[in-house]
């Protein structure tokens, strides 16, 4: 999705530490392979933790439109429905998104539309809670 949104929003994706420009989806995917923890299922050093947060917060940068937020949420809800989930509570950090210049209306407009479609089309009811990262 990160690649899809960057292309739709005419954004260049770069490696957070090297500044290398990703010119294809496969290059971006290859860079994420280096972010996997050494030990299966856990991060046990500062390098792995830093890499995780670089990828996580880097994803916020490509979310610009209501459609982006809708597509992101629907992707999640479709995956939940495929696992026979009928209710999910979505937690998110609104400050992580608003710090990039995205308005509350843009972000929540996409999420709310996806919530309605998830219930009507996928039979997945959803709730939403925000987490305040910085008070």
PLM region spans:
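Metal-cofactor-binding active-site regions of metalloenzymes
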Residues: 1-135
């Amino acid at each position: 999705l990160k690649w899809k949104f960057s292309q739709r929003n005419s954004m260049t994706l770069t490696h957070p530490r090297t500044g290398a420009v990703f010119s294809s989806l496969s290059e971006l995917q290859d860079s994420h392979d280096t972010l996997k923890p050494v030990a299966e299922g856990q991060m046990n050093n500062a390098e792995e933790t830093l890499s995780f947060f670089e990828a996580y917060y880097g994803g916020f940068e490509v979310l610009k439109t209501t459609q982006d937020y809708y597509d992101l949420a629907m992707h999640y809800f479709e995956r939940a429905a495929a696992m026979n989930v009928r209710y999910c509570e979505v937690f998110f950090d609104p400050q992580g998104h608003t710090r990039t210049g995205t308005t509350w209306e843009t972000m929540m407009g996409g999420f709310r539309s996806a919530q309605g479609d998830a219930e009507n089309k996928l039979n997945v009811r959803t709730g939403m809670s925000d987490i305040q990262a910085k008070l």
